[in-house]
Regions:
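Hydrophobic alpha-helical transmembrane segments in multi-pass membrane proteins
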Residues: 2-3, 116
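Short alpha-helices
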Residues: 3-43, 48-60, 68
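Hydrophobic helix-and-loop "lid/oligomerization" segment in the mid-to-C-terminal part
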Residues: 38-211
Length: 211
């Protein structure tokens, strides 16, 4: 592919990039940019540590290899989550009624699905607003929206999975199912669950305009 004309393209996976660690998530790349800006301008680098909770969240949620820098960021990010999380993240944790120390598993199976539900069911901007908002009242509002989105996502997912199981051809070596009524934001999760159930290559798609 042809790279766009830009002042800079930050991607450690580029062929000519000599940055030693290639497996940062997008948020990790953003954090490196912020860190470089602070260093270049003689600012207090410790101020960037306030983002470690969000960096840990993104690193775990993106399922990047938990090695090298990713492991370090997650370790210190989880410490911040358990000691002094951002108010948006704290609001989500309370929604999940977590009382013990938050772990990477809590992010993977609790917090990340809440955040992802915004993009699946309504609009991802609601998750962004939650994470950057500083007003407690507004944070609670966005947190409620994300929680409701996730509950709706669970219901839709269950219904689609049940329908997909009925359409499944048990004799086939592959599994291809579709419907014009299936929510496009949820079918990826359903496909993963079908693979877990049948151990076969699986395609799940939502039909639109006859396709």
């Amino acid at each position: 592919p042809t790279l766009p004309k830009a002042i800079a393209i930050l991607n450690p996976k580029q062929q000519n990039c000599n940055y030693p660690f290639k497996d940062l998530c997008g948020c990790g790349v953003g954090f490196k940019f912020i860190s470089a800006y602070y260093i270049q301008n003689g600012l207090n680098i410790e101020e960037t540590y306030s983002y470690l909770d969000l960096l840990a969240l993104a690193t775990v949620a993106d399922i990047v290899p938990m090695i090298d820098e990713n492991r370090i960021y997650t370790y210190y990010g989880l410490k911040k989550i358990n000691q002094n999380p951002s108010i948006g993240l704290d609001s989500l944790i309370k929604k999940l009624s977590r009382k013990n120390n938050i772990t990477s598993s809590d992010i993977s199976f609790g917090i990340a699905p809440l955040i992802n539900a915004a993009g699946r069911i309504s609009h991802a901007k609601n998750a962004v607003k939650l994470l950057i908002e500083t007003d407690t009242g507004k944070v609670e509002k966005y947190s409620d929206v994300l929680y409701a989105n996730n509950q709706e996502r669970k219901i839709i997912e269950k219904n689609i999975l049940n329908e997909a199981l009925k359409k499944n051809n048990k004799k086939s070596s592959t599994n291809v199912v579709s419907s014009k009524n299936w929510h496009k934001g949820v079918i990826g999760i359903v496909a993963s669950k079908l693979i877990d159930l049948h151990y076969r290559p699986t395609i799940v798609f939502s039909e639109k305009d006859g396709f």
